[in-house]
Amino acid sequence: MSTTQRKDDSHLFTSSCTRQLQVQEDRQQQEKYVIAQPIFVFEKGEHNFKRPAEDSLEETAEPEFTGFLRKRVRSSSVTLHTTDPQSQGVATLSQTRLRSSSFTDVPTFPPCRPVRKNNVFMTSRLLQRSDDMNNVEQGPPMRSSEQVLRPAVLQPSQTQSCQKAGTTFGPGALKSYKTKEKAEHEISEVGSSSSLLSENLPNARSSIQLSTDPCISEAPSGCQPKEDKCSFTSCSSDFVFGENMVERVLGTQKLTQPPLQNLSYAKEKTFKSVLKFPNAVSNSDSIENISLVESAAAFSSKPSQKCLLEKIDVITGEETEHNVLKINCKIFVFNKATESWSERGQGILRLNDTAGRECGTLQSRLIMRNQGSLRLVLNSRLWAQMKIQRASQKNLRITATDLEDDGIKIFLIQASAKDTGFLYAAIHHRLVALRSLAKQGDGGPAESQSDTALPQLNGESCDEDEDEIAQVTKNGSDPSRWSHRQSIVCS
């Protein structure tokens, strides 16, 4: 009896357990249909690891969950999804929030957005189903050329802008405005095609709002961009650059022009009405009619315009003087500090005579100008105490006054042998005459004026040899012989 009772008790126990399990399963199924499982969402980045998805689990889960898949994720907020049993897997969910946090947008499963194909939580059937649903919602596939996001163009009211353009800029501005409207119309067509793409892409909704409805153009002025405001204010302003230029010019002579009848024509022709160049227009018309060869021939046939300078008389101070000798030479000056010769310049040396105060007397001076620049290098008068010495056949040493400090310095004249001989004889001749005049003035025997005075040299040419000049220089101590001779220096 005991064994039979034990068997009955075990049978009753097992039956009661099975009944309890069935009741629990029924309750769970009812709760599953009424209340969906909570979904845990976290904001961290996706993990790169992958886990193989099993289709067998999905097949067992599909009859139980219409459109949901179990996931284990860390959560920061919990949401409750209620499904409609008649939807049969379509993701039309009404979310009821149980516990809120900082997150407001909680994704649903299966997601309504396009999902990557390498997602480990989406199996092949769910991916196929989501693609079919997206194709039904989006319609035919878009071309790659049409999937370019472009901002919508906000057009101002055409009536106001046309009136402003007509009043400010005249008839010429209406043509440019019409062309601008055509270009903006083409841009708006492209924007309308891109607005279709923005409806399908939710990412574009958050960044750019594409629409070409006329209601948006009637929105308040605060929503319009600043560029439209600036363009509208510039059109509405009455200021035109260059207007009334004649009134702003400060001058004694003002250009007079007839009163302008049409305001738009005046604003269009502001600069042309003030300045007129009739010569330039006639020249341009003639140039257009002439070919290139003819213009080149006319240019070459024109005589070259030479700049004719006026002749100016140069006053040197030598106009009243008589030139006796003129040679080309170099001149050096002796520096006592360094005991060396420094070149002063190269040019033409002149020996000039002038009539003295006393009748029959002469006054002479040496003048030298630098070649090229004609800068004055030497300007010294001959006096009785002046010394002259012939250092060599081509060099002649003299004492003369310096132009820099008005002091007496030693100069060296370097020239050809013939020019050096002529210069030495002419200077020595005049120095002897000056010394004799100085002796007579001190109280010496009075002699006739013709014997003591140095006769004025004749400017005519004379031909004498160097040997004769050398003889004169050797016997130059006798001044009486100089008074009876003519000029021995060629001019």
UniProtKB/Swiss-Prot annotation:
InterPro entries: PH-like_dom_sf, Ran_bind_dom, RanBP1-like
A Pfam family of this chain: Ran_BP1
Keywords: Cytoplasm, Nucleus
All copies of domain RanBD1, residue ranges: 270-441
Compositional bias of kind Polar residues: 447-459
Molecular function GO terms recorded: SMAD binding
Keyword Membrane: no
Record has Nucleus as a keyword: yes
A GO cellular component annotation in the UniProt record: cytoplasm
Main location as per UniProt: nucleus
Superkingdom of origin organism: Eukaryota
Region (Disordered): 440-468
Location(s) in or outside the cell: Nucleus; Cytoplasm
Any single biological process term in GO: intracellular transport
Job of this protein: Nuclear export factor for BMP-specific SMAD1/5/8 that plays a critical role in terminating BMP signaling and regulating mesenchymal stem cell differentiation by blocking osteoblast differentiation to promote myogenic differention. Directly recognizes dephosphorylated SMAD1/5/8 and mediates their nuclear export in a Ran-dependent manner.
PANTHER family from the UniProt entry: RAN BINDING PROTEIN, RAN-BINDING PROTEIN 3-LIKE
Complex and partners: Interacts with SMAD1, SMAD5 and SMAD8.
Name the record gives this protein: Ran-binding protein 3-like
Organism: Mus musculus (Mouse)
Organismal lineage: Eukaryota, Metazoa, Chordata, Craniata, Vertebrata
